[in-house]
């Protein structure tokens, strides 16, 4: 039998309540958009951290490859006035040696930023798009009068 767009689906006892098809589609689009925004922000943050921390090694490797006679043979005044081939070889070696420790430092910094910003908590599971959240009824709180003493809970000791 065909489903009517406004009709409610039957609810299983104790389970989550399914959404209407149109509501489910709209929520799925919104969940996808939010997850894509979080992913883009993660990539931008990763690019910023990697670009900042790896910049010294990238500059050394760039000048080493740009100015060494075995690679590009550039005759730019910046290359010929300061160093010769042994100096550019030293730049290449130092750049490659610095690359791995700086990469580890950059990834540790990115992880710490992700944990501090709680970016993993911003990702929404798709089950939220398919099912409505049920409200769990809260137990009623009995107001305590100012003159009465509160009874300590078992297992906790106040010193």
Curated annotation (Swiss-Prot):
Cellular compartment(s): Cell membrane
Transmembrane spans: 43-63, 88-108
Put simply, this protein is called: Transmembrane protein 88
- In what way does this protein cross or attach to the membrane? Multi-pass membrane protein
Q: Which UniProt keywords apply?
A: Cell membrane, Developmental protein, Membrane, Transmembrane, Transmembrane helix, Wnt signaling pathway
Extract the InterPro entries matched here: TMEM88
Q: Highest taxon of the source?
A: Eukaryota
Q: What does this protein do?
A: Inhibits the Wnt/beta-catenin signaling pathway. Crucial for heart development and acts downstream of GATA factors in the pre-cardiac mesoderm to specify lineage commitment of cardiomyocyte development.
**Entry GO CC:** cytosol; plasma membrane
GO biological process terms on file:
negative regulation of canonical Wnt signaling pathway; protein localization to plasma membrane; protein stabilization; Wnt signaling pathway
Q: Name one GO molecular function term.
A: PDZ domain binding
Which organism is this entry from?
Answer: Mus musculus
Return the similarity comment: Belongs to the TMEM88 family.
**How the protein assembles, per its UniProt entry?**
Interacts (via C-terminus) with DVL1.
Q: Is this entry keyworded Aminoacyl-tRNA synthetase?
A: no
